[in-house]
C-alpha cells in the first residue's frame, strides 16, 4: 500500500534495497526524536537558541515533538551548556555529544550514529531539524504511522516545488546551458504541472538497523509531503525576519487556543517599569513608564481582555497605585502567595488557566508562568523566569515589553479566529 501524505495524496514507495521490516516483528518499539543543536553554528552564532517570535528556535520543534505524543523520548544532542539548559526547560532530554562529532566537518549522520550506539533501547530515530520552526505535531504523527502501521523502514519530509531547473555552465565559457526538467518549446503552466518533490529537511525517520549501516534513507522508504507554508529552513540572518513572519502565521503555538485569553495579569515592577525607583532632590519617589506600554494595555482592554496589575514590593505600592489609576486597571499588592492570589482571582472571574495570560519577571512568578495559557517575560528577566515562559519579549522591562506582549496576545487571537473561520468553510461546496 502506498503511503498517505499531508495533502491526502499517495506517497510513492521504494523497495530497491529489499530491506523491508514487517511491522509485526515487534509489538512495541522505542521511538525517539533527536534534535541536533551544535553550539558552533557558523551562519548565525548560537542560532539554535536565538529567539524567534518569542521562543528559542529549538523550542518550536521540541514543543511539536512533545505534543505529538508519538515519541518514547525527545532528545537534544548538543555540545553547549546554554543550549542544554534551554532544551531541558522546554521538556527535552539532553545527549551530550562528544568532541569527535562536534567539529565543523562532522556530519549529522555521525552524530545520530553516536546517539544510537549510546542508546541501545531505541529502535527508531526521528532526526528533527532545529531550523524547521513551522513543524506541527500532526506532521510527526502522520509520518510515524508510515513506519508503525504501513511497515516502512525510513520516512523523510518533502515539499512540492514548481521551479524550472537549468544545467550550470562555467562562467566565461561558451557552452550553452540546457533545461533539466522542461521543454522550452512546450513550457507548462503551473496549474498544468505537478512540480517536483524536494527534501525540505524538517525530519528524517529511520530504523536503527539503517542508521548502523550509515543510512537515513534506505530499505523500504517513502516520503511525507508537507505543504509549502510549513517548509521553513533558517541558515543565515537574512532568513530570520522572513521566518519570524511565517512562524507567527503558520507555527505551532501549543495545545491551548490563544483566542480564549480573557485576562492579563501583569507585574508592575520589572515589567511595566524597569524596576528602578528614582528619588528627586526633594525626596519624592518616581518611576518611569513607556507610553507604548500604556497603549498596549488600552489595546487589550478594547478587545475585551481584562488587565490586572500586580505589585509585591511594599516600597513601590504608592507608585503602583498611581500607575494603576493612570492605566485604568485594578491593582493587587502585598501578596504573600502570588499563585494563591491569582487562583482566587480566577475563581472570582470564573476563568481557567488556559484563559489567562501572565507577564512576569522573577522567581515568584515561575508557577504562574508555567500554568498560564500564555506567559511572557521581558528580555532582561532573570534566567529562572526565562526558563519557564512560553514567550520572551524582544524588549526590556519598562521599554515596550508590555506593548509587545499585548500585540502577541492579539496576534494569536487573530490567528486562531482566522483558523476557526477556515474550519467552518464547507470544502465540498467548491
Swiss-Prot record:
Q: What is the lineage of its organism?
A: Eukaryota, Metazoa, Chordata, Craniata, Vertebrata
Q: Quick one: which pathway? A: Amino-sugar metabolism; N-acetylneuraminate metabolism
- What is the protein name for this chain? N-acylneuraminate cytidylyltransferase A
Which positions are catalytic residues? 187
Where composition is biased (Basic and acidic residues), the residues are: 7-17
By sequence similarity, the record places it as follows:
Belongs to the CMP-NeuNAc synthase family.
A biological process from GO: N-acetylneuraminate metabolic process
Q: Where is this motif: Bipartite nuclear localization signal?
A: 9-27
Keywords, sorted A to Z: Nucleotidyltransferase, Nucleus, Transferase
Amino acid at each position: 500500500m502506498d503511503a498517505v501524505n499531508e495533502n491526502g495524496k499517495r506517497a510513492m514507495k521504494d523497495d530497491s534495497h529489499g530491506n523491508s521490516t514487517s511491522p509485526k516483528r515487534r509489538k512495541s518499539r522505542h521511538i525517539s526524536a533527536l534534535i541536533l543543536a551544535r553550539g558552533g553554528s557558523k551562519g548565525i552564532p548560537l542560532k539554535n537558541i536565538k529567539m524567534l517570535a518569542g521562543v528559542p528556535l529549538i523550542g518550536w520543534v521540541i514543543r511539536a515533538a512533545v505534543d505529538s505524543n508519538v515519541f518514547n523520548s525527545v532528545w537534544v544532542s548538543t555540545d553547549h551548556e546554554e543550549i542544554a539548559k534551554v532544551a531541558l526547560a522546554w521538556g527535552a532530554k539532553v545527549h551530550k555529544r562528544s568532541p569527535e562529532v562536534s567539529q565543523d566537518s562532522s556530519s549529522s549522520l555521525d552524530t545520530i550514529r553516536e546517539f544510537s550506539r549510546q542508546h541501545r533501547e531505541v529502535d527508531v530515530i526521528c532526526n528533527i531539524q532545529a531550523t524547521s520552526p513551522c513543524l506541527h505535531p500532526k506532521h510527526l504523527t502522520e509520518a510515524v504511522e508510515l513506519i508503525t502501521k504501513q511497515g516502512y523502514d525510513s520516512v523523510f519530509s518533502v515539499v512540492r516545488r514548481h521551479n524550472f531547473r537549468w544545467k550550470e555552465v562555467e562562467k566565461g565559457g561558451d557552452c550553452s546551458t540546457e533545461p533539466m526538467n522542461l521543454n522550452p518549446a512546450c513550457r507548462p503552466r503551473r496549474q498544468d504541472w505537478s512540480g517536483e518533490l524536494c527534501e525540505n529537511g524538517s525530519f528524517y525517520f529511520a530504523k536503527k538497523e539503517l542508521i548502523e549501516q550509515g543510512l537515513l534513507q534506505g530499505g523500504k522508504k517513502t516520503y511525507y509531503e508537507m505543504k509549502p507554508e510549513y517548509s521553513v529552513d533558517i541558515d543565515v540572518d537574512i532568513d530570520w525576519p522572513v521566518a519570524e513572519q511565517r512562524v507567527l502565521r503558520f507555527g505551532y503555538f501549543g495545545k491551548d487556543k490563544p483566542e480564549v485569553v480573557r485576562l492579563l495579569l501583569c507585574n508592575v515592577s520589572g515589567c511595566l517599569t524597569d524596576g528602578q525607583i528614582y528619588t528627586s532632590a526633594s525626596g519624592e519617589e518616581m518611576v518611569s513608564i513607556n507610553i507604548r506600554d500604556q497603549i498596549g494595555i488600552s489595546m487589550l482592554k478594547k478587545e475585551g481582555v481584562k488587565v490586572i496589575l500586580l505589585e509585591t514590593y511594599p516600597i513601590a505600592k504608592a507608585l503602583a497605585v498611581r500607575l494603576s489609576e493612570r492605566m485604568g486597571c485594578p491593582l493587587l499588592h502585598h501578596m504573600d502567595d502570588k499563585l494563591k492570589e491569582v487562583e482566587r482571582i480566577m475563581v472570582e472571574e470564573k476563568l481557567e488557566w488556559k484563559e489567562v495570560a501572565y507577564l512576569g519577571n522573577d522567581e515568584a512568578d515561575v508557577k504562574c508562568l508555567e500554568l498560564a495559557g500564555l506567559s511572557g517575560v521581558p528580555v532582561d528577566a532573570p534566567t529562572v523566569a526565562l526558563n519557564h515562559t512560553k514567550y520572551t519579549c524582544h524588549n526590556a522591562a519598562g521599554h515596550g515589553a508590555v506593548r509587545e506582549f499585548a500585540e502577541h496576545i492579539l496576534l494569536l487571537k487573530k490567528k486562531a479566529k482566522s483558523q476557526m473561520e477556515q474550519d467552518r468553510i464547507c470544502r465540498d461546496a467548491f
